[in-house]
Amino acid sequence: MPKPLEATIEIAAPPERVWAVLTDLKRMPEFSPNTVRMMPLGAVRAGTWTINLNHDTYYYPTTSRIVRFEPDRAFAFRMNENRTIWSYQLEATDSGTRLTERRDVPHGVRKPVRIMIDTLLGGEEQFETHLIAGMNETLSKIKSAAER
């Protein structure tokens, strides 16, 4: 079963600024190395669906639904195809904001996804190492955008 993954970064900008960058979902391709496009279907809030195009060896579409939307504090979406939850926690600090990105898989992944990870993505350990590197890259780019 996939384990929770987490990455954190300190950003020299207030939570409101980080939130504005993070929740402008059309900008997600600027930050995430695997996201080609993320299009919200309506206003960005809890319950909103997104249509996404991703790239990791090959291009593939996904959909997600925003499951947590607490301005300046917490944001999360659940990927419908593999049931993973990607979340972001914002915490005010003396120097700005601590931003934490997490990937949780509370119900495991469906069998076709498991087969894809094992056969096309090098197995769970290699895949998770790749995901953590992508999370760190995403956070670094969000930091750069928020500190401008």
Placement of each model-derived feature along the sequence:
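Hydrophobic ligand-binding cavity/cleft-lining segments
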Residues: 1-42
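Short amphipathic alpha-helical segments with heptad-repeat character
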Residues: 12-15, 19, 125, 129-132, ...
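Glycine-rich portal/gate segments that line the openings of hydrophobic small-molecule binding cavities
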Residues: 39-85, 93-98, 133-148
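Beta-strand/loop substructures that line and gate deep hydrophobic ligand-binding cavities in soluble
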Residues: 79-133, 142
